Design a protein with these regions (language model features):
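Helix-to-loop junction immediately C-terminal to a conserved catalytic motif
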Residues: 54
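ABC ATPase signature
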Residues: 97, 139, 152-153
Length: 243
């Protein structure tokens, strides 16, 4: 039992089209400083769940609470002001701007903390520290993903939502991104990560949630889910349904 959850999702139902639910009665609890991984077959509703938490998809039923405050369907910028960060799966950096200019966009209403936050991001992503004046479009795929995460960190989030941060990256860059997220978590930031690489996700996370067809299928300590035959069977069943 988590004594003081920083993020609580209570039985939410959400979707993009009226009358069509992608997420159905999903619940999630995240403790301060906890790393939570969300896995599941393609189309399970994982990314939609994150977007619903961050106010990008309308929640039709249920609630989202941040430190006890109801924040259901608040606009994304208000959640950022409440120290929630979000890194989407689709790349959202500005290639014509420099690395530093991209980071400056993320500082939001905390301009006086620029030097402090820049030092924090540079410490988390040393590869970016020597490239602040470089155009973001010249970075590699892995470096651009690190920049996207770094920009989300500029607003000093206490909760960071990551939507498949390893998508489209080489195995080497995937591992670098996973390692960096673990270091970010060690700094005290709670992380909720949706990830297709189920094994690596559960190796990093403290607890895991398994979604299937928009619903909570299983939850528990990440290490136990990693070796749970029911979870393996769910993935194999998903593959069989596609054939």
């Amino acid at each position: 039992m988590i004594d003081e959850p920083v993020l609580t999702v209570n039985e939410i139902t959400a979707g993009y089209t009226p009358g069509v639910d992608v997420v159905r009665s999903c619940s999630l609890v995240v403790g301060q400083g906890e790393y939570v991984g969300i896995i599941g077959p393609n189309g399970a509703g994982k990314s939609t769940l994150l977007k619903a938490i961050f106010g990008l998809v309308r929640v039709r039923e249920g609630s989202v609470q941040l430190r006890g405050e109801t924040v259901t369907n608040l606009p994304a910028h208000e959640l950022v002001a409440r120290r929630v960060g979000f890194v989407p799966q689709v790349e959202n950096i500005f290639p014509s701007l420099t690395v530093e200019e991209n980071l400056r966009i993320g500082i939001y209403q905390r301009r006086r903390q620029w030097d402090e936050r820049l030092a924090f991001v540079a410490g988390m992503f040393p590869v970016l520290a020597s490239r602040f004046r470089q155009r973001a479009g010249l970075l590699s795929g892995g470096e651009r993903q690190m920049l996207a995460i770094g920009r989300a960190l500029m607003s000093e989030p206490s909760v960071l939502l990551l939507d498949e941060p390893s998508a489209g990256l080489s195995p080497l860059n995937q591992e670098l991104v996973f390692e960096r997220t673990a270091e970010i978590n060690k700094s005290g930031i709670s992380i909720v990560m949706v990830e297709q690489n189920a094994q690596r996700c559960l190796e990093i996370a403290h607890r895991g949630y398994v979604l299937d067809q928009g619903r909570n299928a299983y939850t528990g300590p990440a290490g136990e889910l990693l070796h749970d035959p029911k979870v393996v069977e769910l993935y194999l069943g998903s593959l069989a349904r596609k054939q």
